[in-house]
Amino acid sequence: MMASNVLSRLLPQTGQSVYETIRQHDNDSDASDVEERAGLVYDDDVNLGNRFSDRELEEAMADATREGSSSPSDTFLTPQIAQRGERSASSGPRMRKPNNPRFMRSVTPRPEFVEDDLDDDHDDDVPASLLMEGQHDDEYLRTRLPPPPSHHFSDPQPSRSARSPRREHIRTFAFVVGFTTFLTNCIDYRLVRTSKSLDQILISKCTSRMSASSTFLLWLLCLFWIGKIFQLILDIRRLKNMHDFYHYLLGVSDAEIQTISWQEVVSRLMTLRDANPATAGAVSAFNRRLLGSQSKQRMDAHDIANRLMRKENYLIALINKDILDLTLPIPFLRNRQLFSRILEWNINLCIMDYVFNEQGQLSSRQYTPLAEWKFREFNELWHLFEKRINLSYPYATRYVDQFPKDKTVQVAGFVAFISGALASVLALASILDPELFLGFELTHDRTTLFYLGVFGSVWAFARGMVPEETLVFDPEYALLEVIQFTHYFPSHWKGKLHSDDVRREFAVLYQMKIIIFMEEILSMIFTPFILWFSLPKCSERVIDFFREFTVHVDGMGYLCSFAVFDFKKGTNVIPQGHINQRDARQDPRVDYFSTKDGKMLASYYGFLDNYGGNPRATNANKRAFHPPPTFPSLGSPPFVGASNIGNRQDPIQARVNTASAALGQQSMLGATRLGALGVGDTQSPAPSLLLDPQHQPSASGFRATNHIAPHHRQRLGRPPPAPVSESIIDDNEPSIAAARRPAPRRKSGQLHTNSGSSEALGAGDSNVEDSWGMKSGGEVNDEDAEENVDDVVGGAGVLGLIQQFQKVNKDNRPRAAVGL
């Protein structure tokens, strides 16, 4: 057996090729693929077929071949490698006998092909990126080839940049432990007053005189420190692989790693993916079937974010839906939620690790850990979230300062005046005669310099509590600026941004640092009570949550259903408005299968803000200029002022109509808590270069519907509905509005208002289809075909229609009719 094993390694393989094995495996597994028959599979090819056909993909690839375009990965290769790759690709696959045995070679040999396989595959064009995988035996490539890439590339600072902070943390930890041990056990504080040097107060052999508890704690800290060192040593190989992946495959140098954006990294990952036929998206249907087993390697910005934030998306949904009971089981603190870093670590240990396996100033404020999880959106990486939240701190501080307590300000002003006057007199006297006055004792053993420091500190503290005289009292505007960055706008805040109730609720999320620090200290005492008494009450809801909101995506595994954005249709659905708010709120299914305060829709727009457009362009999150609102024209919709909050333009409109934050709950069922949209025109999101065709936002925005579809766990994998005819409106022409006579089959007259948004053009049984009598195939109902112009315009003719327009313009009334 030993000899046969050695001979099998030395002799070339005579079996079937790799492609033949893949083809045979796919043919055998077509009828028995468990994931294809599973109800939770999210089929990307269904959405992909809606946008591109195989013929279009083949024609695009043929055009690129005729034009002689090089492989996208050539930009990441050195000139020598690129030239050798071109020669190897032009000459076609060749049978090369390995010079050395396999166990003596550092790289994997190139697989040998049988001549029949070459004739069957008809694929002689080998991309240049594949020529890097051990196909050259010269010493140059052997030294330049990187190790197999690691999947831990979420942090855009690999290798040396990643090792430096960890080394500094280990050194800092060692200094803190050693310095604390020295201060607590090696100094005799009773001799400090009578001694003149440090040697007189030091305790010799202090470690041998330590107590048993101190010695045990010191040994534990030393073992922890040694474990951190071993962990860093073991991670050096992984960090080296990460460095090689960035340097050789992505073309990111060590100097560029500090300034490159994450969007640019994702763009280069997609370029590298397209250079590999196993992961390229623009392939024919035949080749896609052959490479079907490699679907796990296909990725874009959405797939990468879902992989990196698999656990975080679940925790975001748990916090958003108020599944976790975080109240203190204490009589006088039952309504207060405690969520510290220690409790977060315990929740990850008890819930997340069980579900998943391993395959400043004294008065300054900051957001609490609970507020961070409320503000964070699905598929939002930590460095992007941290950047967004840090931009909101100046506006949050200004909003909190908008509510000064008058009595506190008066007392602080009086104290600042007294302390400032005394400090000014002492400072002036010290300047006039410093030698005499600085040594002068105002009280026993208290000189002028001591009181100068005390009064100066009191003046600075009291002066900081007094607001500036130039501060404009406008809390509503200040909070709207905060919402621009936090994207947190509960529905019950609407119309109450100036109230003290909203201020108190926001102050719970934005507390002083000293209070957050005290909560972290007290959480070591209260965390066991929450884990023992409060969280067990919601254990059934936690289990139901993971069962109901988990879907299986082909190639990525199990994900949170809210994080799997359906960029075409299905999950993000906006109704047209025949379900009023009261009926929607009374439906418990809508509340259960939905996110609160439009969390999923806000995450969708936030994801497009981060990954939309050109990653090499300027910051996509830069606040755009919004011109002042215009007066309602003849073609204005009837809900002009519906989006005003306190007689202001909603700033969330800047995020491509994120007035959905005020819509209530965005549902996985296909309905929101507020039935009517009525918040202005919704523009279609722009396509992104970092998303595949199946993840691109549709041209008409979200699909519109006026009913609640039954929820099922197979909803994401269902085939798309039949197309519905939509009216084409010219943007350069004003919309014509007139009262339409109802069809004879309707019981009562009803005016179908034009929503003026892309959501109004929908599919299914929408009111657009009913009012115009359209069927799914674009046919016109017979009973509406005989309707003449006089019935539409009321028998007045063209002149009468013009008179109606003039009357509407004169009375300054909004239109209320459908376009002809």
UniProtKB/Swiss-Prot annotation:
Homotrimer; forms a homotrimer with a central pore that forms a path between the two membrane leaflets. Residues 313-333, 514-534 dip into the membrane without crossing it. This is Autophagy-related protein 9. Residues 67-81 have a biased composition (Polar residues). Disulfide bonds: none annotated. It is a multi-pass membrane protein. Residues 1-169, 237-312, 334-410, 468-513, 535-820 are cytoplasmic. The keyword Phosphoprotein applies. InterPro entries: Autophagy-rel_prot_9 (IPR007241). Residues 193-215, 432-446 are lumenal. GO terms for cellular component: autophagosome; cytoplasmic vesicle membrane; endoplasmic reticulum membrane; Golgi membrane; phagophore assembly site; phagophore assembly site membrane. Keywords: Autophagy, Cytoplasmic vesicle, Endoplasmic reticulum, Golgi apparatus, Lipid transport, Membrane, Phosphoprotein, Transmembrane, Transmembrane helix, Transport. Residues 59-166, 711-787 are annotated as: Disordered. Phosphorylated by atg1. Atg1 phosphorylation is required for preautophagosome elongation. The chain crosses the membrane at residues 170-192, 216-236, 411-431, 447-467. The gene is atg9. Forms a homotrimer with a solvated central pore, which is connected laterally to the cytosol through the cavity within each protomer. Acts as a lipid scramblase that uses its central pore to function: the central pore opens laterally to accommodate lipid headgroups, thereby enabling lipid flipping and redistribution of lipids added to the outer leaflet of atg9-containing vesicles, thereby enabling growth into autophagosomes. Phospholipid scramblase involved in autophagy and cytoplasm to vacuole transport (Cvt) vesicle formation. Cycles between the preautophagosomal structure/phagophore assembly site (PAS) and the cytoplasmic vesicle pool and supplies membrane for the growing autophagosome. Lipid scramblase activity plays a key role in preautophagosomal structure/phagophore assembly by distributing the phospholipids that arrive through atg2 from the cytoplasmic to the luminal leaflet of the bilayer, thereby driving autophagosomal membrane expansion. Required for mitophagy. It is found in: Preautophagosomal structure membrane; Cytoplasmic vesicle membrane; Golgi apparatus membrane; Endoplasmic reticulum membrane. The keyword Magnesium does not apply. Belongs to the ATG9 family. It catalyses: a 1,2-diacyl-sn-glycero-3-phosphocholine(in) = a 1,2-diacyl-sn-glycero-3-phosphocholine(out); a 1,2-diacyl-sn-glycero-3-phospho-L-serine(in) = a 1,2-diacyl-sn-glycero-3-phospho-L-serine(out); a 1,2-diacyl-sn-glycero-3-phosphoethanolamine(in) = a 1,2-diacyl-sn-glycero-3-phosphoethanolamine(out); a 1,2-diacyl-sn-glycero-3-phospho-(1D-myo-inositol-3-phosphate)(in) = a 1,2-diacyl-sn-glycero-3-phospho-(1D-myo-inositol-3-phosphate)(out). GO terms for biological process: lipid transport; mitophagy; piecemeal microautophagy of the nucleus; protein localization to phagophore assembly site; reticulophagy. It comes from Emericella nidulans (strain FGSC A4 / ATCC 38163 / CBS 112.46 / NRRL 194 / M139).
